[in-house]
Curated annotation (Swiss-Prot):
This is tRNA dimethylallyltransferase. The keyword Nuclease does not apply. Its EC number is 2.5.1.75. It comes from Kosmotoga olearia (strain ATCC BAA-1733 / DSM 21960 / TBF 19.5.1). The gene is miaA. Catalyzes the transfer of a dimethylallyl group onto the adenine at position 37 in tRNAs that read codons beginning with uridine, leading to the formation of N6-(dimethylallyl)adenosine (i(6)A). Residues 33-36 are annotated as: Interaction with substrate tRNA.
């Protein structure tokens, strides 16, 4: 028995098909999305609607407030706990989303017992303040694999990887390889033609703005959350903050959201190429009924066809 994981770029249509699939087999979704974890951020993160949630239960969304820290350690723990709860109910857990980092965390495992080291962390932060860019250079020396994987602007993860190294004497990358996740996942990747995906992104962003994205960010501001928070760096929110602060027009902010989302989708697609053994389903070349039949068959085969 293996665990199905359905991945796909943003706006590819994962939720749409999973909700329909839920009428055919008893599934529940464990979200693999690093932004839907935040409360009060519904429109910009494209969370399932109330209607969709009434048809298909989703786990690991609305987990923390926008100003709370949340890392891959906590995600993996909560996600696997949710999976166990779904299995106990006699239903099939389906991991679904687009976060490559969260997917890697589930499939490769992480070391959960490396404690936070505030002394090392503060020393690293001070070093970066005094010599900007120094932590990236340091990471390249001590953990080149992590250096290649972590975005240059992701200071939080850079500090964590260095923190683990200076605390344990071993790189987090090497520790992750030792502590493999015992659960075996089978990956199914949903894809679309590039032009079609770009068009879907354009339409989705327009719909987000029409549905109240600006008002959602205004509410976050009124609740006391600030644009400097990690959660507010999310595509869709960062650009609207710029609009609210008078830095760009609404038209320009919308254009930036579309552009940045397209770029993000391209990065996701490149990331998913690493899963050589994954089954790939083209949503552009297959009709809806056939897609649902394929997903149903694949999930039941992966799960062993046993549920209930």
């Amino acid at each position: 028995m293996k665990i199905p994981m359905i991945l796909g770029a943003t706006a590819v249509g994962k939720t749409q098909f999973l909700v329909k699939l839920a009428s055919l087999i008893p599934i529940e979704v464990v979200s693999v999305d690093s932004r839907q974890i935040y409360r009060y951020m519904d429109i910009g993160t494209a969370k399932p609607t109330r209607e969709e949630l009434s048809k298909l239960k989703h786990h690991v969304i609305d987990v923390v407030d926008p100003d709370e820290d949340f890392n891959v350690f906590e995600y993996r723990k909560i996600a696997l706990k949710a999976m166990d709860e779904i299995v106990k109910k006699g239903r099939i857990p389906v991991f679904a989303g687009g976060s490559g980092l969260y997917a890697e965390t589930l499939m490769k495992g992480i070391v959960e017992n490396v404690p936070r080291n505030d002394k090392v962390r503060e020393a690293l932060k001070t070093l970066e303040v005094n010599a900007p860019g120094s932590l990236r250079k340091l990471l390249e020396k001590v953990d080149h694999e992590a250096y290649e994987k972590i975005h240059p602007n992701d200071l939080k993860r850079t500090i964590r990887y260095l923190e683990v190294f200076f605390t344990t004497g071993k790189t987090l990358t090497s520790l992750q390889k030792i502590h493999k996740c015992s659960n075996q996942f089978t990956v199914i990747i949903l894809e679309r033609d590039r032009r079609e995906l770009a068009e879907r992104i354009e339409n989705r962003v327009d719909k987000m703005v029409e549905s109240g994205l600006i008002e959602e960010v205004v509410r976050l501001k009124e609740m006391g959350y600030t644009r400097e928070l990690n959660s507010q760096q999310t595509i869709g929110y960062a650009e609207i903050w710029s609009y609210l602060e008078g830095e760009v027009t609404l038209e320009r902010a919308t254009e930036l959201i579309k552009r940045n989302t397209r770029r993000f989708a391209r990065r996701q697609i490149i990331w998913f190429r690493r899963y050589k053994d994954a089954k790939r389903i083209s949503l552009s070349e297959t009709n809806e009924n056939d897609i649902l039949s394929l997903l149903k068959e694949d999930i039941l085969n992966v799960w062993g066809g046993k549920y209930g």
